Amino acid sequence: VAASAIVACDPAMCAVLHADGFPSTRLLVLGTATADPLGSDVVVATLAVRNEFGTRLQSVYAPVVIASFGTGAGRIDIRAIAPDGTAAYEAALAADRRSRISAGGQLVRNPRIIVTGVARNALSAGDVDPRLLMMLAALADQQQVRITAFGDPSPGASSVVPLRSVQIAALGPGAEAEASLRSMLSLIDAQRQPFQPLRAALAGSSALTVEYAAPSPLGLLGGP
């Protein structure tokens, strides 16, 4: 998740996150003084948190898993908070998907974007993060863009969670193609939130990888 996100967690997990360098000001410690995870962006659902909130964790506070680690009692789910309740969140998620389908379709039809196969299908299906969609459109305004793959580094994410990373390939060998990738990277590095990525880097001279932090924002593209 982004360093700016507010993370709700049980006292033991919050202590671990703080020891790993996560700012204490961004941690919402669940317990007697904090009755619920509302006010945070994500909740770290350890066994203690699941036991505390039971079915309300999914049905009321945080319906979508954006990452999951481990199994059984040791499983840890990272869940996106629904600040206005599950029904409102699911409606916003459905509307956002419709907007992503529309924006993805525009990219597929853009003559300055080269994309085929699985990556093309992801765009058409609305499976791509809105920040990536807007970033790719901005890049295509400047030059031709070859998309080779979209990905999501988070294990165990719900199927409704958008893909938050993209790999852009050089258009050919040589210094000119590498310069084109570096030009894209410079534009991406100049972005401010919410369009500043978690990481963006060149893979040698042949590709550029961009990844955005979870959770993906809703409503960024406007209504369908």
Predicted segments, located by residue:
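Extracytoplasmic
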Residues: 1-12, 17-27
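Short loop/helix-cap segments at secondary-structure boundaries that form the rim of catalytic
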Residues: 15-22, 36-37, 53-57
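Aromatic/acidic, Gly/Pro-rich catalytic loop(s) in extracytoplasmic/lumenal soluble domains
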Residues: 40-224
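Short beta->alpha connector loops
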Residues: 13, 32-33, 48-49
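Structured loop/turn residues at beta-strand edges in well-structured enzyme cores
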Residues: 2, 37-38
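Short acidic low-complexity segments
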Residues: 28-37
